[in-house]
Regions:
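Ferredoxin-reductase
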Residues: 1-61
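FNR/FR-type flavoprotein reductase catalytic core
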Residues: 49-168
Length: 168
């Protein structure tokens, strides 16, 4: 989902937004995958009625969005070879982090976990940034058979660990 608007409150990868959807009382917290001046990129998984409604929004739909929520990742701590580890919906905010770390000349490795090969997303985008990508799938249909923690065993020389996603 791409949103046009004021992105000045977003200061670090890993922050999130809260979307107010018409017909729903509760806002939907969605992590920011990437942002630039005037545009937000959000990637979400349909898990309920709210995110289902988001898939049906027409281009140009006006939304009430609270931006710049959460602390985000501290880019100054990554060292020369940061390791990014995430699973499922924890992967999108790591993309924005990888983009900024590679722009700083860091050697980024991303270990990305999925339930099965058919659910893999953003892996090629990480590679396009110059990041090394290790895939782990719970069912063994792609990459390393297991969880992201199993994929971490393939990387031993990292200088800092960034994580986002569900507990293994």
């Amino acid at each position: 989902l791409r949103l046009a608007g004021d992105t000045s409150a977003i200061t670090a990868p890993g922050q999130f937004v809260n979307l107010k959807l018409s017909g729903f009382f509760l806002r939907r917290p969605i992590s920011v995958c990437d942002w630039s001046d005037g545009e937000l990129t959000l990637i979400y998984k349909v898990l309920g009625h709210g995110t289902e409604a988001m898939t049906g929004m027409a281009p140009g739909t006006a939304l009430d969005v609270l931006t710049g929520l959460g602390n985000g990742f501290d880019l100054s701590r990554g060292g020369e070879h940061p390791l990014l580890v995430g699973g499922g919906v924890g992967i999108p905010p790591l993309y924005g982090l990888a983009k900024r770390l590679t722009a700083q000349g860091k050697r980024v490795t991303a270990v990305l976990g999925f339930n099965r090969a058919s659910e893999i997303f953003l892996a090629e985008e990480f590679r396009a940034l110059g990041a090394e990508v290790v895939i782990a799938t719970a069912d063994g249909s792609a990459g390393i058979h297991g969880l992201v923690t199993d994929g971490m065993a393939a990387v031993s020389d990292y200088t800092y660990l960034y994580t986002c996603g569900p507990e293994p």
